[in-house]
């Protein structure tokens, strides 16, 4: 993996991706933050050596380098998932690349279903902790100790100082921002009523199919990490309604302006 990482980093440096401070992963229906940045360079994932290729049709599949609120940022416009047939090492490969390029902070967004019935669709949830239900770990491979501590500490996977800033920004801008536990499952099928009941018993407030692998690797690399979910549907097992993926995307897009406000104002403080 080290050789692949070096090849990818050399390619991106040659394209002008120089010393980004912050990495941002944009999830389902949340790609419009790129309209807020001054783009310096952008490259399709298809053209980046050793990079996975986005197969989800509503993910743009671009790596973008630019300036936002006075900071150099690198943005993944679309991410990878284990349900696309990728390994967890593939899914998290871009995080390792962004770290080698220079980022110190990783910000992540996603669309998720609300298990906590006090949370409503269209609202946002700051992730305070998570449940890794992906069936494995992105650190479970030979040679991982060459890239960082094998037994990565996960006592505080989400940076407390950044989360406190997010909460203060939300309050100042009258944005409802819940805080809770995110469960990451494989997908791509949505959950059954029994699975939602199980997740609630386990302590999950929301469920999705991403984010946790990237956060694990961010911690492995010593990055500060934070993540926010857009709650796109309500997962009440006693009144479960069929959900269409187009509805999820539409709800994420509706909540996107508040997400953009939070990210922009946070980045200004970093």
Name each model-derived stretch.
Residues 99-100, 200, 219:
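Non-catalytic positions within long, well-ordered alpha-helices that form the structural scaffold/packing
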Residues 1-154:
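Metabolite-binding pocket within alpha/beta catalytic cores that recognizes anionic/polar moieties
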Residues 163, 168-205, 263:
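Active-site/ligand-binding-proximal alpha/beta "capping" segment
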Residues 209-247:
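Zn-dependent metallopeptidase/amidohydrolase metal-coordination segment
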Residues 235-270:
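His/Asp/Glu-rich mid-to-C-terminal helical/loop segments that flank catalytic regions of hydrolases
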Residues 147-158, 186, 196, 252-264:
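Polyanion-binding loop/helix "lid" in catalytic or ligand-binding cores
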Residues 95, 196, 212-215:
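Generic hydrophobic/aromatic pocket-lining and core-packing "Φ" positions
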Residues 104-105, 205, 224:
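Short acidic/polar active-site loop segments enriched in Thr and Asp
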């Amino acid at each position: 993996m080290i050789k692949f990482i070096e090849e990818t980093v050399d390619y991106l440096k040659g394209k002008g991706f120089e010393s980004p401070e912050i990495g941002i992963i944009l999830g389902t229906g949340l790609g419009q933050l790129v309209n807020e940045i001054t783009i310096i360079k952008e490259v399709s994932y298809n053209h980046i050596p050793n990079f996975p290729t986005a197969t989800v049709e509503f993910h743009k599949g671009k790596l973008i380098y630019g300036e936002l609120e006075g900071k150099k940022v690198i943005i993944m416009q679309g991410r990878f998932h284990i349900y696309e047939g990728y390994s967890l090492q593939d899914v998290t490969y871009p995080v390792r690349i962004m770290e080698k390029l220079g980022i110190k902070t990783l910000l992540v967004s996603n669309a998720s279903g609300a298990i906590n019935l006090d949370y409503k669709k269209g609202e946002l949830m700051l992730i305070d902790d998570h449940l890794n239900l992906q069936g494995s770990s992105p650190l479970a491979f030979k040679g991982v100790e060459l890239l960082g501590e094998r037994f990565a500490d996960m006592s505080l996977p989400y940076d407390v100082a950044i989360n406190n800033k997010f909460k203060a920004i939300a309050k100042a801008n009258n944005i409802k921002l819940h805080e809770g536990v995110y469960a990451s499952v494989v997908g791509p099928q949505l959950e059954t009523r029994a699975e939602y009941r199980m997740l609630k018993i386990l302590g999950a407030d929301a469920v999705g199919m991403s984010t946790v692998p990237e956060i694990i690797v961010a911690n492995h690399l010593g990055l500060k990490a934070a993540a926010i979910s857009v709650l796109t549907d309500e997962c009440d097992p006693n009144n479960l309604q069929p959900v269409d993926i187009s509805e999820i995307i539409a709800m994420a897009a509706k909540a996107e302006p508040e997400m953009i406000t939070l990210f922009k104002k946070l980045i200004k403080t970093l």
